[in-house]
C-alpha cells in the first residue's frame, strides 16, 4: 500500500468486509460485478483455459496474456476508450497480465468463520476481549454447544422454559418432535446462537471504551487489596492483573487503528492472486500445483454444500447444518494455519499441506526469502572483531567501508571547502587517497551515526546505532558488552552497517537506538550489557594475584624503602625478589614500575592509601604490631598496614594489592566519575 506521503509500505492487519470487496470487485459495462470465486475448478481439462468464476478466472484476476481476452481478441492495453476496456463477449479486461500478481478475489462464506490466528494464537485476542476461557470459545466455534441470545422485549421459549418447568415436564413427548420440524429453523435463528456467528455477535456488541474503564477499575481494586498471605490467591490475583493490562492495551490498539473487533470473524475470505499460487505444467502431462489451490478448493466445496443446505433449511436437519458449518470452519483453519487443529492436514500421498502461515513464516517464507535480506544502498558488511579500546557507543569502521558509505558527504565537503572544483576531480582525490580526504572523512563521521545489524533481527536490540571511528584492517570493531543484544560472538560472525540519511532517521538513531541507551532487555527488564565469556576470564586473570598470603614475607617487606625499584633481572637479588614486596606511594609509581618490567600484573605490592575511616574504625585485630627504636610502630593486618608515630597518630596506610587490582579500580573510578559528570550536565 502507499501512504499519504507516497511511501510504499507493507501493513498486516484486520480489514473490513467492504475493503475485501473493494480489492476484488470490478464493474463490467453490462452492470455485472465480478470478483467472487464460486467454483473450485481451475483449468478446463480440454482447452487448458481458466474456468469461469473459478480460482484462475480471467474475468476476476485478469488475462493470462497481456491485452488478450479469453476469446482471443486483442486490444492494446491502456487505450483511451473506456468503453472498450472489457471484452463484450467474455468480460475480460484488456490489461497487462502482470495484474494477476496483485488482483485479488474473495469467497462469500455461507456462515461466519473465526480467524484462527486471533482465536488460537497466544494470547488469544478473541478470548481476551470477551473475557472468556479459550476452551469454551472453541467449543462454541466448533459446534460443541450453543448459547441463548439475550432478549428483553419479548418472552422466548428458553425463558418461558425456566418459568414453567413443571408444565414442560408433562409435555416432553410433544416438545421433542418440535426440534425436527421446519419451525425449529425459525426458533434456532431467533433464539440460539452457535458457531462463529455467536462470537461475531458478542464482538459486535462490545464497547471498547467501557472495556478499558471497567478493566482499569478492577485492576485498581486488585492493586488496593495487596497480598493476602495465601500463595494461591496471590498468584491468581497477579495473573488477573496481567490479563487486565493486556486487555486494556488490546482495546486501546483497536481504537487507535480504527479496527472493529468483529472483523476477527470472517464473512468474506480473500483469495490470493493466481500468480502467487501457480499451477505449472511439466513434460509428460505432469501438473505441479501450489497447496494453497487445493486448500481453496476444499473451502469452496464445503461452503457450496453449506449454502445448498441453508437454501433447503426446511428439509435439512439442524445437526447436518451445524456439522457442515464445522467443516467450513475447519477448512478455513487449514487454509490459514494447517497445524492449528493439532495434527496438520495431509493429502492422499501423506504429504502435509503448506498453508498460508507456512508460506509466510520461517527462513524460507515469503518475507525472509523474497522481501528481506536484499542489498540496499549505503550499506556494507564485514566480520566483527572485539574492540576493547572502544567506548560503549562506538564502533570501528574499516577505511574501505567508511569511504564508500560517506563518499557523497566527502565529495560535498570537498567542493564546499573549495578543495576541488567538481565531482570528477573529487572522486579522483578519493581514489588516490589524498590526506585531505581522510581529514574530511573523520569530520563527517564525527557527527553522523551508523546502524549495525546482525541477522536474524529477532528483537529491537538486533539493530543499534553507534558513533563510527576509523580503524585499520577490513573488519568491524565492536565493544564486547553489546554482543548479548545482537546475540553475537567473535568466532566469524558478520554484521551489516547501514547509514541513516534523513534528519529524522539520524535523530531517531541518536535518541532511541544508541547502544548506551539500550542497557536493559525490552522483554524482561534485566541488564543486557553485562560482562560475559572473555571479559570475565580477563577480569579473573587481572585480579587473581598471587595467593601466597601475608605471612609468607613476615609482613614488613621493604618497609624501610617505600619507593624502592627492585631489579628483578639481577640474579644476585633472586632471594630478595622472592621475599620482598615493594611499597609505592601512588598508583602511577606502580604503573611506571610495570612499564619498566620491574613488577608483573599479579605481583603483590604495598600501595599507599588515603586515610579511610572504614579502615581506621575497623574492629579487626592486627596480626602483629612492630615497634621501632624511634617510637614509630606498624600495625600489620591481613590486607593493609598502618604506620603511626610516637604520639599514636596514624601517619599513613598501605594496602596490600596487585597491579591488576589497581588497574581495575582505576577503570571503575573513571567510569563513575564520567557518569557523574554526564548526569550533572543533563540535570
Swiss-Prot record:
One GO cellular component term noted in the UniProt record for this chain: DNA-directed RNA polymerase complex
Positions contributing to Mg(2+) binding: 489, 491, 493
Binding site for Zn(2+): 69, 71, 87, 90
Family membership: Belongs to the RNA polymerase beta' chain family. RpoC1 subfamily.
Principal subcellular localisation of the protein: plastid
Manner of cofactor binding, per the entry note: Binds 1 Mg(2+) ion per subunit.
Coiled coil (residue ranges): none
Gene coding for it: rpoC1
Cofactor(s), names only, from the UniProt record: Mg(2+); Zn(2+)
Main EC class the enzyme belongs to: transferase
Classification via SUPFAM superfamilies: beta and beta-prime subunits of DNA dependent RNA-polymerase
One MF annotation (Gene Ontology) recorded for this entry: DNA-directed RNA polymerase activity
InterPro entries found in the cross-reference section: DNA-dir_RpoC_beta_prime, RNA_pol_asu, RNA_pol_N, RNA_pol_Rpb1_1, RNA_pol_Rpb1_3_sf, RNA_pol_Rpb1_clamp_domain, RNApol_RpoC1
UniProt source species: Triticum aestivum
Name the record gives this protein: DNA-directed RNA polymerase subunit beta'
GO biological process: DNA-templated transcription
Task performed by this protein: DNA-dependent RNA polymerase catalyzes the transcription of DNA into RNA using the four ribonucleoside triphosphates as substrates.
The keyword Methyltransferase is annotated on this UniProt entry: no
Keyword Chloroplast: yes
Domain of life: Eukaryota
Amino acid at each position: 500500500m502507499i501512504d499519504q506521503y507516497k511511501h510504499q509500505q507493507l501493513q498486516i492487519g484486520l480489514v473490513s468486509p467492504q475493503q475485501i470487496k473493494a480489492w476484488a470487485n470490478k464493474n463490467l459495462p453490462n452492470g455485472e460485478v465480478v470478483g467472487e470465486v464460486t467454483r473450485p475448478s481451475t483449468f478446463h481439462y480440454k482447452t487448458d483455459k481458466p474456468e469461469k468464476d473459478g480460482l484462475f478466472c480471467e474475468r476476476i484476476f485478469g488475462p493470462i496474456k497481456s491485452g488478450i481476452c479469453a476469446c482471443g481478441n486483442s486490444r492494446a492495453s491502456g487505450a483511451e476508450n473506456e468503453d472498450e476496456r472489457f471484452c463484450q463477449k467474455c468480460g475480460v479486461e484488456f490489461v497487462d497480465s502482470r495484474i494477476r500478481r496483485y488482483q485479488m478475489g474473495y469467497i462469500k462464506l455461507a456462515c461466519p468463520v473465526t480467524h484462527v490466528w486471533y482465536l488460537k494464537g497466544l494470547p488469544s485476542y478473541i478470548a481476551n476481549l470477551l473475557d472468556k476461557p479459550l476452551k469454551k470459545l472453541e467449543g462454541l466455534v466448533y459446534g460443541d454447544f450453543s448459547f441463548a441470545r439475550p432478549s428483553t422485549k419479548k418472552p422466548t421459549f428458553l425463558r418461558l422454559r425456566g418459568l414453567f418447568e413443571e408444565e414442560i415436564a408433562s409435555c416432553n413427548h410433544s416438545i421433542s418432535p418440535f426440534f425436527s420440524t421446519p419451525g425449529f429453523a425459525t426458533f434456532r435463528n431467533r433464539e440460539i446462537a452457535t458457531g462463529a456467528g455467536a462470537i461475531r455477535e458478542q464482538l459486535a456488541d462490545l464497547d471498547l471504551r467501557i472495556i478499558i474503564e471497567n478493566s482499569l477499575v478492577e485492576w485498581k481494586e486488585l492493586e488496593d487489596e495487596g497480598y493476602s498471605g495465601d500463595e494461591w490467591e496471590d498468584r491468581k490475583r497477579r495473573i488477573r492483573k496481567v490479563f487486565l493490562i493486556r486487555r486494556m492495551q488490546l482495546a486501546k490498539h483497536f481504537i487507535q487503528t480504527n479496527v472493529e473487533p468483529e472483523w476477527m470473524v470472517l464473512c468474506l475470505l480473500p483469495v490470493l492472486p493466481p500468480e502467487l499460487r501457480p499451477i505449472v505444467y511439466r513434460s509428460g502431462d505432469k501438473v505441479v500445483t501450489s497447496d494453497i489451490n487445493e486448500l481453496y478448493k476444499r473451502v469452496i466445496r464445503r461452503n457450496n454444500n453449506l449454502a445448498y443446505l441453508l437454501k433447503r433449511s426446511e428439509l435439512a436437519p439442524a445437526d447436518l447444518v451445524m456439522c457442515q458449518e464445522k467443516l467450513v470452519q475447519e477448512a478455513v483453519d487449514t487454509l490459514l494455519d494447517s497445524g492449528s487443529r493439532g495434527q496438520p492436514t495431509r493429502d492422499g500421498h501423506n504429504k502435509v499441506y503448506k498453508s498460508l502461515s507456512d508460506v509466510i513464516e520461517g527462513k524460507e517464507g515469503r518475507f525472509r526469502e523474497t522481501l528481506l535480506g536484499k542489498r540496499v544502498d549505503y550499506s556494507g558488511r564485514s566480520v566483527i572483531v572485539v574492540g576493547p579500546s572502544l567506548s560503549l557507543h562506538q564502533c570501528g569502521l574499516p577505511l574501505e567501508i567508511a569511504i564508500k558509505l560517506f563518499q557523497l558527504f566527502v565529495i560535498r565537503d570537498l567542493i564546499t571547502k573549495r578543495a576541488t572544483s567538481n565531482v570528477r576531480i573529487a572522486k579522483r582525490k578519493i581514489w588516490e587517497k589524498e590526506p585531505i580526504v581522510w581529514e574530511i572523512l573523520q569530520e563527517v563521521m564525527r557527527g553522523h551515526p551508523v546502524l549495525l545489524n546482525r541477522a536474524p533481527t529477532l528483537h529491537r536490540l538486533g539493530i543499534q546505532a553507534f558513533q563510527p571511528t576509523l580503524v585499520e584492517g577490513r573488519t568491524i570493531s565492536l565493544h564486547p558488552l553489546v554482543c548479548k543484544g545482537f546475540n553475537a560472538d567473535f568466532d566469524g560472525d558478520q554484521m551489516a552497517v547501514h547509514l541513516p540519511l534523513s534528519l529524522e532517521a539520524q535523530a531517531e538513531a541518536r535518541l532511541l537506538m544508541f547502544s548506551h541507551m539500550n542497557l536493559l532487555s525490552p522483554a524482561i527488564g534485566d541488564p543486557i550489557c553485562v560482562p560475559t565469556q572473555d571479559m570475565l576470564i580477563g577480569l579473573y586473570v587481572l585480579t587473581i594475584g598471587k595467593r601466597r598470603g601475608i605471612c609468607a614475607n613476615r609482613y614488613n617487606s621493604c618497609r624501610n624503602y617505600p619507593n624502592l625499584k627492585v631489579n628483578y633481572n639481577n640474579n644476585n637479588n633472586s632471594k630478595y625478589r622472592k621475599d620482598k614486596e615493594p611499597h609505592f606511594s601512588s598508583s602511577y609509581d606502580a604503573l611506571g614500575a610495570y612499564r619498566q618490567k620491574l613488577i608483573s600484573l599479579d605481583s603483590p605490592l604495598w600501595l599507599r592509601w588515603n586515610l579511610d575511616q572504614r579502615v581506621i574504625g575497623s574492629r579487626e585485630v592486627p596480626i602483629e604490631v612492630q615497634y621501632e627504636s624511634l617510637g614509630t610502630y606498624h600495625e600489620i593486618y591481613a590486607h593493609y598496614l598502618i604506620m603511626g608515630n610516637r604520639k599514636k597518630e596514624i601517619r599513613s596506610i598501605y594496602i596490600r594489592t596487585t597491579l591488576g587490582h589497581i588497574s581495575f579500580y582505576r577503570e571503575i573510578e573513571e567510569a563513575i566519575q564520567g557518569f557523574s559528570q554526564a548526569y550533572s550536565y543533563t540535570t
